[in-house]
Amino acid sequence: MTPLAKLDDFDEEGNATVRQVINIWIRLSLMLTRRRPEIAVSSLMKHVLPVIGDVPLNKITRLRLNRLFNILLAEGKISEAKRVFALCKQFFGWAETQGYLAHSPLSSMKRRDVGGRNTPPRERALTDAEIWVFWHGLDLWDISEQCRWALRLCLLTARRPDEVIRARKDEFNLRTGVWRQGTRNKSARDHSLPLTPLAIICINALFDASPKDSVWLVPSPKDAQKPLSRGAITQVIRRMLRAGRGLGIDAFTTRDLRRTARSKLSSLNVPNDVARKIMNHSLEGIDRVYDTHDYLPQMKQALEAFSDNIKGIIDAPDYFDLRHKYEGEFLELPEISLLYMER
């Protein structure tokens, strides 16, 4: 009997438990369609299976599921409640399609029914003055070289944090100046990115900080055979912002570094199709089907202009005369900030 047949070895009278059917769904759907299925599986193992795992699938009601979501909402975990709802809706819809269930109890519910409407998309991007503070602030904290240079590389390459910390050393050809990321990204599209001199400085620093026998660009300090956890660089940003003598600028996240890079590309008049290629977003309209050009020369030119702009910012002696929010407005740090200066 095959492993799948063993999982699906129960009668067709509707007596299968949630746990039995969810194990099949994980194997046949979740593992095949999710880029990071382990995140979804962890959420199911923590919040769903302990509560309703042993209940017969055909006994699950909308009320019972809402009680499960409400536990998370009552704890203030709105995002997690919405994530669990989305997973449950996907699972019960699949179970209905497969015939394990006559009708999904969540078919008429929408994501906004759990915890209200989604929060609006973030709009935070760092100003020139804040980029200076971010870059030089990294040198003032007692953090690992991996975190310090990985965060800088996130900004310079406009990559998602996961794409940097899960990069392998053999993806980088420093002789040709290209990062061949392949399909290891959110959209699973094959992607290559030209590397600027400033980005190569970051990569060389990460190579120097990585044990020779590790395949990872940013290995974990606890086990060099594993990549650094995404939470590590996220925590660094939080520490720098929340410390008594912190950066002194408005809160931002690692993902906001990517938004900062994209906004910079626009300010440098980079054509939208080139910027989209750098971000690894699909082209718009019919171009997404017929335009197969790799755009590497155009991306190289755009990224070099972006890198030169960043270098001009970080080479400034201070942040006083760097642009901040509006023309003529300058950044004022609180006196307690480690980077506070007097004119």
Feature map (PLM): residue ranges:
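Basic, Lys/Arg-rich DNA-contacting stretches centered on the C-terminal catalytic core
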Residues: 114-125, 138-142, 162, 173-201, ...
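Short, polar N-cap/turn motifs at the start of nucleic acid-interacting alpha helices
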Residues: 103, 170-178, 249-251, 270-290, ...
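C-terminal secondary-structure termini that scaffold catalytic or DNA-interacting sites
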Residues: 10, 187, 197, 201, ...
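Short, aromatic/basic-rich helix-turn unit that serves as a nucleic-acid recognition element
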Residues: 14-45
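Short, basic (Lys/Arg/His-rich) helix/loop patches that form interaction surfaces
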Residues: 132, 136-147, 157, 193, ...
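Short, charged hinge/linker segments at domain and secondary-structure junctions
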Residues: 2-7, 59-62, 93-118, 321
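Basic, Lys/Arg- and aromatic-enriched nucleic-acid-binding interface segment
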Residues: 74-87, 97, 101-161, 165-166, ...
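Non-catalytic DNA-binding core/recognition domains of DNA-processing enzymes
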Residues: 33-49, 61-66, 78-95, 109, ...
